[in-house]
Amino acid sequence: MSYIPFPDISPEIFSVELFGATFALRWYALAYIAGLLIGWRLVLRMIRSDRLWTFGAPMTEDQLERLLTWVILGVILGGRLGFVLFYQPSHYLAHPLDALKVWEGGMSFHGGFLGVMVAVIAFCLRERISILPVADLLAAATPPGLFLGRIANFINAELWGRPTTLPWGVAFPGEAAQTCPGIEGICARHPSQLYEAALEGIVLFAILAILIWRRGWLRWPGAVTGAFLAGYGCARFLVEFVRQPDAQFVTPGNPLGLAWEIGGYGLTMGQILSLPMILLGLYFMLRARRTA
């Protein structure tokens, strides 16, 4: 079977030892930092562009700086809590202190999304500003962070795809990745992280940019948020067909790792969590156009 060897890239950019402890800067952490900084600059540019708004930007630059702290907390706390509740609740109920070990990995986008949503609502209520226009700004600035995060997933050799015989299949390191039932030798897999980087990052960013800068969708509160939710939900739903499900869902009787199954068909946990996003996104877009 032909495959592409996994590139020899360390998950750690560099590490230092201080007082007997090792501290490392990982690509995943850098992706979070860079994504937040790029998103902040994009929101700042949209706030400063008067032509995008009918009655002016929904918040000031000073408010944006304060919001950034709330968003960071929402992403980290929501992402970790979402992983604990959605993917491994039984493990963390038995070992609750493991939920604090964020350095061991385990973040959920859907949980991070809910965390940011709660943070934005709380911030807007405190600052007495409209929620939907602020949500539109953050939605427009999110795809670059998603792109970088998925690239970091690839570098970390995690969240790889299902087995494939396609010529661009990648032989990810590790016995779990390279051993597949019914396949002799090294098992090549879909580089599903790169599929998601392209769809959730590049394609979704391009669509939102056109809607904002060419179509003026920021004048309709909630429209950009709806487009982001529906776009991300569709992208994630599609990629789930070739993405290897989380190990806790895979059993001998359920090799596809379906979280819900009926009549031989079913959905993965990622697809189940994406469907409400798609429906909510469609609702926001329809609501925005009706109230325009």
Swiss-Prot record:
Query: Which segments cross the bilayer?
Result: 18-38, 67-87, 105-125, 129-149, 193-213, 222-242, 266-286
Return the InterPro entries for the record.
Answer: Lgt
Q: In which pathway does it act?
A: Protein modification; lipoprotein biosynthesis (diacylglyceryl transfer)
The enzyme's E.C. designation: 2.5.1.145
**Descriptive protein name:** Phosphatidylglycerol--prolipoprotein diacylglyceryl transferase
Pfam families noted in UniProt? LGT
Task: State the family it belongs to.
Answer: Belongs to the Lgt family.
Q: Does the keyword Glycoprotein apply?
A: no
| Keyword Cell inner membrane part of the UniProt annotation | yes
Write out the coiled-coil annotation as residue ranges: none
- Which pairs of positions does the record mark as disulfide bonds? none
Q: Which UniProt keywords apply?
A: Cell inner membrane, Cell membrane, Membrane, Transferase, Transmembrane, Transmembrane helix
The membrane topology of this protein is: Multi-pass membrane protein
**Gene Ontology cellular component annotations, sorted alphabetically:** plasma membrane
Q: What domain of life does the UniProt record list for this protein's source?
A: Bacteria
- Ligand binding (a 1,2-diacyl-sn-glycero-3-phospho-(1'-sn-glycerol)): 150
- GO MF terms held by the record: phosphatidylglycerol-prolipoprotein diacylglyceryl transferase activity
Give the GO terms filed under biological process for this record. Answer: lipoprotein biosynthetic process
Cellular localization per UniProt: Cell inner membrane
Q: What does this protein do?
A: Catalyzes the transfer of the diacylglyceryl group from phosphatidylglycerol to the sulfhydryl group of the N-terminal cysteine of a prolipoprotein, the first step in the formation of mature lipoproteins.
